Amino acid sequence: MDNIKIIVASDSIGETAELVARAGVSQFNPKQCKHEFLRYPYIESFENVDEVIQVAKDTNAIIVYTLIKPEIKKYMISKVNEHALKSVDIMGPLMELLSNSIEETPYYEPGMVHRLDDAYFKKIDAIEFAVKYDDGKDPKGLPKADIVLLGISRTSKTPLSQYLAHKSYKVMNIPIVPEVTPPDGLFNVDPSKCIALKISEEKLNRIRKERLKQLGLGDKARYATEARIQEELDYFEKLVDKIGCPVIDVSDKAIEETANDIIHFIEQNKSK
């Protein structure tokens, strides 16, 4: 028995149509259903359709297609009917059923599945990046980061990094401590990618005292004293002035509000 020719035609890469076709073929004895796939991706014109139709006529092939753009799909159907060819519309019936059920018009944009997949994997990469480079663990992350957060302890660097990662930004955060020299690479990073997180002395004092209580320690530890906090804030301001990056006051802001401010800064600089 001759091989059955199956033409996979799509206005995207054709992966969906081929997967469905292969699933169908797998239900038959391979000895009785010898087959060959011919993929025609990115069908964007009537001429592309004509090419598929000609090959189908010459080889007596079955056309399996996912064509989203209405004018291209309509032309394919007319040509298939004109030449009495065998064909299967993979997406059309489902899209029509969904459209009627929810009373909404489809986007009619090819490749949406892959765009969604790309967005998902980009977000996962960003989340993994935020974990790997949290708290300045590895300075090698600096040139790879979309955003570098700077701040002294208890300025919400880690939760902000995670929140922004879920927005698909690769974020590294670096703790600013007077006794610890910042990584050399920090001064080579574009200042427009750096965001310094500022907090008032009073607010930080309250947060740190509460943190010490949670740890079962007295609130008189140096970590929460006004002198220590002022020392850290002074060092922070000198470092930020040297870098020349934007500063956001997080004293009375929710994580979401601060994150939106950061995104605004970053996107504004991208458009310059």
From Swiss-Prot:
InterPro entries: Kinase-pyrophosphorylase (IPR005177), PPDK_reg (IPR026565)
E.C. number: 2.7.11.32, 2.7.4.27
UniProt-annotated binding residues for ADP: 151-158
Coiled-coil region list: none
Domain of life: Bacteria
The reaction(s) this protein catalyses: N(tele)-phospho-L-histidyl/L-threonyl-[pyruvate, phosphate dikinase] + ADP = N(tele)-phospho-L-histidyl/O-phospho-L-threonyl-[pyruvate, phosphate dikinase] + AMP + H(+); N(tele)-phospho-L-histidyl/O-phospho-L-threonyl-[pyruvate, phosphate dikinase] + phosphate + H(+) = N(tele)-phospho-L-histidyl/L-threonyl-[pyruvate, phosphate dikinase] + diphosphate
UniProt-recorded Gene Ontology molecular function terms: ADP binding; ATP binding; phosphotransferase activity, phosphate group as acceptor; protein serine/threonine kinase activity
Keywords: Kinase, Nucleotide-binding, Serine/threonine-protein kinase, Transferase
Keyword Acetylation in annotation: no
UniProt enzyme class: transferase
Protein family per UniProt: Belongs to the pyruvate, phosphate/water dikinase regulatory protein family. PDRP subfamily.
Reported function: Bifunctional serine/threonine kinase and phosphorylase involved in the regulation of the pyruvate, phosphate dikinase (PPDK) by catalyzing its phosphorylation/dephosphorylation.
PANTHER family, A to Z: PYRUVATE, PHOSPHATE DIKINASE REGULATORY PROTEIN 1, CHLOROPLASTIC
Protein name as annotated: Putative pyruvate, phosphate dikinase regulatory protein 1
Organism of origin: Staphylococcus epidermidis (strain ATCC 35984 / DSM 28319 / BCRC 17069 / CCUG 31568 / BM 3577 / RP62A)
Biological classification of the source: Bacteria, Bacillati, Bacillota, Bacilli, Bacillales
